Structure formats: C-alpha cells, structure tokens
C-alpha cells in the first residue's frame, strides 16, 4: 500500500508513526518532529509525525485534553510546512472530519470506537489513509469486519493497529499472534508499542504505564512481522501532559529504532513460515 509517498507492507522497510501523545505547544511539536525526522532519515525509516489536538478518552474530567482543534491543526500544519513530514492525528465522533482531513495526511480512529460503524465509515469517506486501532476488548480476527466497513465506502488505504488487550483490571497484554492474524485483513499491520504498556486508570485519576517494557514488546512485534511501529515519545516523559508513564524518551529513540530496523531487515529477508503452515 502506498502511504504518504512511500510503500508499506511486509515486503517493505519498517515505517514509524511517532510523536507526543498530545500537542502541548508549537515549539515542542517542532523540536520533537525535527529530531525524529533527523534520526529516521539517518536510519532510512519512513516517518509520520503524530500528535493529538484533543484527547477525548481521558480518565478524569480534569485531565489535560489538548489545545483544541483550531490551535492544534495550526501547529500540525506548521510542522508539515516547516519540516516537510506527513502528519497523523486522531479524530472522534464529534470531530469536524472534513476540516481535519484538509490538514493532516493520515486519520486515526481510537481503539474504543472501532465498533462504531457510522464513525468508521464517516472517517473512511474523507479520502485519507486511516489507521484503525483495534479495541482492547476485540479479538484480532474480528478486525476483518471493521476493515470491511471502511472499505465498503470506497477507501482502500486502511491500516490496522494492535495496542494490547485487556487482561483483568488496569492492565493490558500483547498477544503477538494477533499481528499475524490481522494480516488476514489484507491491510498493513502496525504495532503500538507504547499504549501496549499502558495501565488504564492505574493511577486512580489517570493512567499509569510501564515504559521499561516498550523495547521488549517493540522488538517482539517487529520480529513477528509488521509493516510499521507506533510509539509515543516525549523529550521529558515525566513532565508530559498526557500518557507520560508509557511514553518512550526521545533521547533513547534512535538506539531503539536502530535495533528494530536490524530485526526488521532480518525477518523480512527470511520470510514468514507461519503463512505456509497456518491452518484456516
């Protein structure tokens, strides 16, 4: 599949979707995107910058949600114009989709909304590539129905994203088999390495996270075989205004990407035996 001027899939190099969880300021966005662009260019990794102008799914009403659509889209537009990188943001049921699609290159649908048929189809109708996050409650094989809803309105540029599955209260686990299962949708599969270590509501009024496991899960996912990796990153995660506990430090990103790129090249050169031996 072509995405933002480059090809993605199991026959192509790993691509990266990365940035802070939420847009905090123009300067932070430009600085973070600039550093990510530099490191991905050095490593030959196609890169899409991500950040949210509104985080509707927050644990508590007083949690920081973002700068709002007008200011947020203006900052994303500045990132595109200044750095020449494609941008992604997530949308919600009450988002003016046409206004967002006029600015960003990729639309993302939140995991909790993956079963909302009207929403998925309305997003797909905007004519932009869509990254559909699998719900924490959903079996990987059920994503084929979600994809069919999006394709039914004429959008063939669909990606599916694994971000962990609920495992009791306040914790998620990642089943690497789901990455192979979701290939059956015919879509590029993306692994969200940072939300997969989130502890939803785990700190009472906000979510916790175990960022030390980000590289473990990222390595495992790339070894399993994915088109791309999604990672939220921040120059100072302890001071991030949203999802800091599971954000990967920007200063440690390049070393992790080097490792992931090496693994990706190895597994994609050798092929995927499970495609031959899986029983349908």
Swiss-Prot record:
- The kind of enzyme this is, by top-level EC class, is transferase
Gene Ontology cellular-component terms listed: cytoplasm
Cite the GO molecular-function annotations of the record.
Answer: 3-deoxy-8-phosphooctulonate synthase activity
Q: Can you say where in the cell this protein is located? A: Cytoplasm
What gene name is given for the protein in this entry?
A: kdsA
Q: Which UniProt keywords apply?
A: Cytoplasm, Lipopolysaccharide biosynthesis, Transferase
Q: What is its main location?
A: cytoplasm
Cross-referenced NCBIfam families: KDO8P_synth, PRK05198.1
GO annotations under biological process? Answer: keto-3-deoxy-D-manno-octulosonic acid biosynthetic process
Q: In which pathway does it act?
A: Carbohydrate biosynthesis; 3-deoxy-D-manno-octulosonate biosynthesis; 3-deoxy-D-manno-octulosonate from D-ribulose 5-phosphate: step 2/3; Bacterial outer membrane biogenesis; lipopolysaccharide biosynthesis
User: Which regions form coiled coils?
Assistant: none
UniProt superkingdom: Bacteria
Q: Lineage from the top down?
A: Bacteria, Pseudomonadati, Pseudomonadota, Gammaproteobacteria, Chromatiales
EC number assigned by the record: 2.5.1.55
In the record, the note on similarity to other proteins reads: Belongs to the KdsA family.
Q: Which InterPro entries does this one have? A: Aldolase_TIM, DAHP1/KDSA, KDO8P_synthase
User: Which named protein is this?
Assistant: 2-dehydro-3-deoxyphosphooctonate aldolase
Q: Report the catalytic activity.
A: D-arabinose 5-phosphate + phosphoenolpyruvate + H2O = 3-deoxy-alpha-D-manno-2-octulosonate-8-phosphate + phosphate
């Amino acid at each position: 599949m072509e995405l933002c001027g480059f090809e993605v899939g199991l026959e192509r190099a790993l691509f990266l979707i990365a940035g802070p969880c939420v847009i905090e300021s123009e300067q932070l966005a430009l600085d973070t995107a600039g550093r990510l662009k530099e490191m991905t260019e050095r490593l030959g990794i196609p890169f899409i910058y991500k950040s949210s102008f509104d985080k509707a799914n927050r644990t508590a009403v007083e949690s920081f949600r973002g700068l709002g659509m007008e200011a947020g889209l203006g900052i994303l537009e500045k990132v595109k114009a200044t750095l020449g990188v494609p941008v992604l943001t997530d949308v919600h049921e009450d988002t003016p989709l046409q206004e967002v699609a006029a600015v960003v290159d990729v639309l993302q649908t939140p995991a909790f909304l993956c079963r909302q048929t009207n929403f998925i189809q309305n997003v797909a109708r905007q004519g932009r590539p869509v990254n559909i996050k699998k719900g924490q409650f959903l079996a990987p094989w059920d994503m084929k129905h979600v994809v069919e809803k999006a394709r039914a309105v004429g959008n063939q540029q669909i990606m599916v994203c694994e971000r962990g599955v609920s495992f009791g209260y306040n914790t998620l686990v990642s089943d690497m088999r789901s990455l192979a299962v979701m290939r059956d949708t015919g879509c590029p599969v993306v692994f969200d390495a940072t939300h997969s270590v989130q502890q939803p509501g785990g700190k009472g009024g906000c979510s916790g996270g175990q960022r030390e496991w980000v590289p473990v899960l990222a390595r495992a996912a790339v070894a399993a075989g994915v088109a791309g990796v999604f990672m939220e990153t921040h120059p100072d995660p302890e001071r991030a205004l949203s999802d800091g506990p599971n954000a990967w430090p920007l200063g440690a990103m390049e070393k992790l990407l080097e490792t992931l790129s090496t693994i990706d090249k190895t597994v994609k050169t050798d092929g995927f035996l499970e495609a031959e031996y899986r029983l349908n």
